[in-house]
Amino acid sequence: MLKQGKMDFFVTFNNVNLTYFTGFSGATALLIPKQGEGTLYVSAVNYEQAKTETKGLAVDLLKRGENLMQKIAAKTAPNKLAVDSLSIESWRSLAKAVGGEEKLETAGNLILELRSVKDQDEVKLIREACNLAEIGMQMAFETVKPGVTERRVAAEVEYAMRKKGADGTSFDTIIASGISSAFPHGSCTNRTIHQGDLVVVDLGATYQSYRSDMTRTFTAGKSTEKQMKIYETVKVAQQKAFKAISPNISAAQVDGAARRAIEAAGFGEFFVHNLGHGVGLEIHEAPILSPDSKDTLAAGNVVTDEPGIYLPGYGGVRIEDTVLITSNGAERLTTGYYSLETLR
């Protein structure tokens, strides 16, 4: 970005981007020059840890009372800076320090685009996060039954993942049962699961800052014919989308493959969200798989494939996998538990 543009430095204050570039999450800012060594700015509480955990960077201690913007200006003057993720107030403060807004330029979506293509090390971490998610889903499969509360299921799921090495969850675990399963982002409550309920389980694990995302739908007991029809429709839609995923295809085309399958079964109006999104250091990243997405998929993208049908007052079904886009197609990083019933 620096070599191709008119900027001489890039500076980021964004916690996620700081982790992406340095592997260290406790920094305040990172300054990268067009040539030479970058500088990581940290407070005293993180100084020794930063020196130990970061390589190839100068670590600059921010002493109490020092002005970060002025320190950056002193190192970059009289050059121009590309800036990422800054509040209006901080932008103005930095502009004042460097001598005017004409010295600054937003980095726009360049960093998001860079992060959307994962390297081998990132894929390895995401793969492990997905393995941990599968452990959580196994526990959900074993725990979902009449008489158990949603929060009990969530607690068992999260403990199972942490016990096997997860740093935490990718997001608040969703266990949505009964009519609440018709809420795409339903919360986890103390509701008791009843016989015959549809139960949507949406979970993910974090491993060394990288995330996974996986959803399955179960019934607590024997499924009805209507539940099975909805489930099989979603399952077919997910498979259609998965088969469509490949490098250089538009994200909108992949969304369309799933959406057409659901529409053909008569449930089109009940598929109310996008098909998927990128996954990495954040649970929602580029690219976006939606009907109006302008994104084109690329090898190294990690995305979700998560069609769903949600009938208000009745219940819903969603099936979701985390998917790696390869040079010639796609690979599911989460697998298993594609059966609706939890009790045989």
Regions found by a protein language model. Give the residues of each.
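Active-site neighborhoods and metal-handling regions in enzymes and metal-associated proteins
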Residues: 1-344
